[in-house]
Design a protein with these regions (language model features):
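Amphipathic alpha-helical
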Residues: 1-10, 38, 43-85
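Structured DNA-binding interfaces in DNA transaction proteins
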Residues: 84, 102, 140-143
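Catalytic-site beta-strand/loop segments enriched in glycine and acidic/polar residues
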Residues: 88-124
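Residue patterns forming the tRNA-binding/recognition surfaces of aminoacyl-tRNA synthetases
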Residues: 1-25, 115-188
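Short glycine/proline-enriched turns and hinge-like loops at secondary-structure junctions
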Residues: 37, 111-113, 131
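Short, flexible, solvent-exposed loop/turn segments with mixed acidic/basic and small polar residues
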Residues: 30-32, 103-109, 152-155
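Extended, domain-scale alpha-helical bundle/helix-rich regions
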Residues: 14-49
Length: 188
């Protein structure tokens, strides 16, 4: 999966369990510290999970459009973010919360696992997508300890401290990454 990447991405894989036959959707993230800000799961148009609704006409139309206009990772960041809302949800691995599953035109099947968790407050593409589809935008990183921040047009992608994140609160990003990866590994 990662053999075609330029450079190396450090991160972890997280399994999200769907409400469809408890099917797992595996995501790869370089920012596990932002998991408490996840408001959606986005999968590639050709992700295996799409088999469960492949005969739905609206999905077929979306998939055709998305695959026709799909390009490289860098060109995807410039394109309009489009999504198809599936009828399914996943359970957040650390909260009693359901997260919607979307098929998105900015996710590539051959990059990572072909699925991401969207954290709109801290990723610009996720923010554009969340605004378009009225999804929650919850900041979980702040430049100052214990201080909330407001996200408007630009995601906060700088260094800082974790907020709104239960057992990760007040940790640095690096310390939070280590702690959340340990918790994820314990759940396996």
């Amino acid at each position: 999966m990662q053999k075609n990447w330029i450079g190396k991405s450090i991160g972890c894989e997280i399994d999200f369990v769907s409400d469809f036959k408890n099917t797992k959707i595996k995501i790869f993230t370089t920012r596990p510290d932002t998991i408490f800000g996840a408001s959606f799961i986005a999968i590639a148009p050709d992700h295996p999970f799409t088999e469960y609704f492949k005969n739905e006409k609206n999905f077929q139309d979306f998939k055709e459009l998305a695959l026709k206009n799909i390009g490289t990772e860098s060109s995807l960041s410039k394109n309009e973010k489009l999504g198809f809302k599936t009828p399914f949800f996943v359970s957040h691995p650390f909260l009693n919360k359901k997260i919607p599953i979307y098929v998105a035109n900015f996710i590539l099947m051959d990059y990572g696992t072909g699925a991401i968790f969207g954290c709109p407050a801290h990723d610009q593409r996720d923010l554009e997508f969340a605004k378009k589809y009225n999804l929650e935008i919850l900041p979980v990183v702040s430049p100052n300890k214990s201080k909330s921040i407001t996200i408007s047009d630009h995601a906060y992608a700088d260094d800082g401290y974790i907020i709104n994140s239960d057992f990760l609160n007040n940790l640095t990003i690096e310390d939070a990454k280590k702690k959340i990866i340990q918790k994820i590994e314990k759940k396996r």
